[in-house]
């Protein structure tokens, strides 16, 4: 079966599973998931499965991407904050719906790979950066929409504070060893209305930035009568 046929099969499965927003389905149809899948898993690009990527992270299951995107309601929105760029697939789907996507990722390696994919796909409305997702992106706040693609143990006040009036935050909450729930929070008149959208399973949202690997020490070698040299 060709990739195109597999994509059609996946879209039909998403419709059967409750994804009814035509804008979301169109965005998923327009984004080539194979561009975000590691080579060993290319034959599974359009299976409804989560797939491993670098740094112990995952490329989310298409059903989960569609479900979160539908819950977010990003079509026609001016800007969206995404916490957790990962492979960039969710980012790319969002870029087909809103005018600009600001995306924060703690791993420099992942953001570099994602940026190369964005350039290859000519996604010029994506603004990625390396940063601590727990802090959001206060310089660009407030945001009418925020989506978090890793699970904090509870809702982060720093992200809620960056929601615009009437804004929506979609976030999986809970510890990995316990039950996680997908939540949708809507800010109305300085209060937050919370809805539970069902169980999910995500990698944890980790605070802070990873330490850079130390540079290897220079090797000192004896070079004979002329003395010592650094390799």
Protein language model features and the residues they cover:
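Class I SAM-dependent transferase core
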Residues: 1-81, 85, 89-93, 97, ...
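Conserved nucleotide-cofactor-binding alpha/beta core module
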Residues: 73-193
